[in-house]
């Protein structure tokens, strides 16, 4: 049964030795199994199905540096129970008053939420959420919705000032997070990552599960806008000016 299989995977016994490599590598060895290997960039997907709700969180399955991870692209303004407004926007899950009080640069708020705040730009929020969670990880804070909704670059700058005695502006804090994210992405590119791997399993694009399949053009348009926001080419390689602005020339020298 399942309990025995888990033990086989842990001890690499029999088929457990194959499955211990993860579903991507296992599917390459098990005939006709690839349609059932639900992963992005080799990481198995969490329980949330993007056919039910296409939003910042599910775009993050494609964009984040680990692959199909549910902890790197959580929006601080998500609305879990409502639908999507289109390939590029989702409904706002917090009040206008809450948005105005968020710890986020004002220009970024307008770009993501509009003025007055009415909706959420999925690609722009994906970039911001990734950098916010990068800060949370770097500062050793737990990633929970209350933290996402209350912590931001201003607070993190004050925390750093309290510890090291240096006043760090919110813009500098976000730039550091962007540098970390791009450094991880450059590592992946160096190790062979290609734009073609920013792709959901075909079943999400072909099969109806009570929700219609996602349209591939929806996914691709969101990815295109995300790459623009990141300062990347459409093949997911950072532009020279982005590399220069982040001081990552040495790390990007392999490109």
Residue ranges, per PLM feature:
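Extended C-terminal regions of large enzymes
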Residues: 1-255
């Amino acid at each position: 049964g399942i309990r025995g299989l888990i033990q086989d995977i842990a001890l690499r016994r029999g088929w457990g030795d194959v499955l211990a490599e993860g579903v991507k590598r296992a599917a390459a060895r098990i005939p006709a199994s690839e349609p059932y290997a639900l992963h992005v960039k080799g990481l198995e997907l969490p329980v949330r199905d993007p056919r039910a709700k296409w939003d910042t969180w599910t775009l993050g399955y494609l964009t984040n540096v680990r692959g199909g991870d549910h902890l790197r692209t959580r929006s601080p303004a998500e609305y879990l129970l409502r639908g999507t407004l289109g390939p590029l926007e989702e409904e706002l899950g917090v009040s206008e008053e809450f948005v105005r009080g968020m710890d986020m640069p004002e220009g970024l708020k307008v770009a993501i939420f509009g003025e007055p705040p009415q909706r959420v730009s999925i690609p722009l929020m994906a970039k911001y959420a990734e950098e916010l969670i990068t800060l949370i990880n770097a500062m050793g804070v737990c990633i929970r919705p209350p933290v996402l909704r209350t912590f931001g670059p201003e607070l993190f700058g004050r925390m750093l000032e309290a510890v090291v005695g240096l006043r760090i502006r919110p813009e500098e804090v976000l730039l550091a997070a962007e540098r970390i994210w791009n450094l991880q992405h450059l590592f992946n590119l160096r190790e062979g990552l290609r734009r073609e791997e920013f792709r959901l399993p075909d079943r999400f694009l072909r099969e109806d599960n009570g929700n219609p399949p996602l349209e591939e053009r929806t996914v691709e348009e969101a990815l295109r806008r995300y790459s623009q926001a990141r300062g990347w080419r459409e093949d997911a390689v950072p532009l020279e000016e982005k590399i220069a602005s982040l001081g990552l020339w040495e790390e990007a020298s392999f490109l």
